[in-house]
Amino acid sequence: MSDVLIRDIPDDVLASLDAIAARLGLSRTEYIRRRLAQDAQTARVTVTAADLRRLRGAVAGLGDPELMRQAWR
């Protein structure tokens, strides 16, 4: 596994990363490692027009109050 050194990260950015990592019970290193892995994976995912049409069909009823009432009974 390779190491990466990143210089000139603003203090407020590091503080934010540390706070997020702490909330998740992770070290800064582990949090950044996971985010980089997640970002690398997400970059390979492409969303097509067909994907968006399927999504539109799947969530079409969410704006229907009666359908939502029935779903929660």
From Swiss-Prot:
One MF annotation (Gene Ontology) recorded for this entry: toxin sequestering activity
SUPFAM superfamilies: Ribbon-helix-helix
Keywords carried by this UniProt record: Toxin-antitoxin system
Lineage, top ranks: Bacteria, Bacillati, Actinomycetota, Actinomycetes, Mycobacteriales
Name the record gives this protein: Antitoxin VapB2
Biological processes, Gene Ontology terms: cellular detoxification; regulation of DNA-templated transcription
Pfam families: RHH_1
InterPro entries named among the record's database cross-references: Arc_rbn_hlx_hlx, CopG, Ribbon_hlx_hlx
Coiled coil regions, renumbered to chain: none
Source organism: Mycobacterium tuberculosis (strain ATCC 25618 / H37Rv)
Subunit structure: Forms a homodimer, which binds to a toxin homodimer, which then oligomerizes further to a hetero-octamer. When bound to toxin VapC2 the toxin activity is inhibited; 1 antitoxin may suffice to inhibit toxin.
Entry function: Antitoxin component of a type II toxin-antitoxin (TA) system. Upon expression in M.smegmatis neutralizes the effect of cognate toxin VapC2. The C-terminal helix of the antitoxin may obstruct the toxin's RNA-binding groove, blocking access to the active sites. Additionally, the C-terminal arginine of the antitoxin may remove Mg(2+) ions from the toxin active sites.
